[in-house]
Amino acid sequence: TIIQFAVETGMRRSEILKLQWNDINLNTGIASLYDTKNGDDRHIPLTKKAIKLLSNFTQTTEFVFPISANCLRLAWERCKNKSNIKGLRFHDLRHEAVSRFFEMGLSVPEVALISGHKDVRQLFRYTHLKPENLIAKYSNIF
């Protein structure tokens, strides 16, 4: 679930692990992130899938994902080993999310708001668009 949530939100691992239930409003679909990597607070819209993932959780602790960074790292390594995947970092899920946001048609300012990137050049480093995913959008324009 934490992997799906990471891809749906584009949040950093540290932001996901610090996320508390009182930071989330499932009615408005907004997650509030405080003291992020760049020092700013950020309020991000959640996708329907992210809201559904969170709605299926039982709130037993103040943290949405009550695990340590080390526990997540070890679980990530186990998942990669079981799947025989080499070289994939948890942070790559953030790259995937940013690429998906652009493929959904979100603008640069919208994706920057969600991801927290202040520098557009850095944001574009996270973007790995797939031509096959843009065919339908391209067809609608011409």
Model regions and ranges:
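Residue-level detection of the helix-turn-helix DNA-binding "recognition helix"
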Residues: 21, 77, 81, 103, ...
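C-terminal catalytic core of tyrosine-transesterase DNA break-rejoin enzymes
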Residues: 4, 8-11, 15, 92-118, ...
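P-loop NTP-binding/switch modules centered on Walker-like glycine-rich loops
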Residues: 1
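Catalytic-site neighborhood detector that most strongly recognizes the C-terminal catalytic loop/helix
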Residues: 35-39, 49-51, 70, 108, ...
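Conserved beta-strand positions that form and line the central face of beta-propeller blades
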Residues: 32, 64, 89-92, 122-125
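Conserved tyrosine-mediated DNA breakage-rejoining catalytic core shared by Y-recombinases
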Residues: 9-14, 18-53
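Exposed loop/turn and edge beta-strand positions of beta-sandwich/beta-sheet ligand-binding modules
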Residues: 27, 40, 59, 84, ...
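Active-site/catalytic core of tyrosine-dependent DNA strand-transfer enzymes
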Residues: 47-86
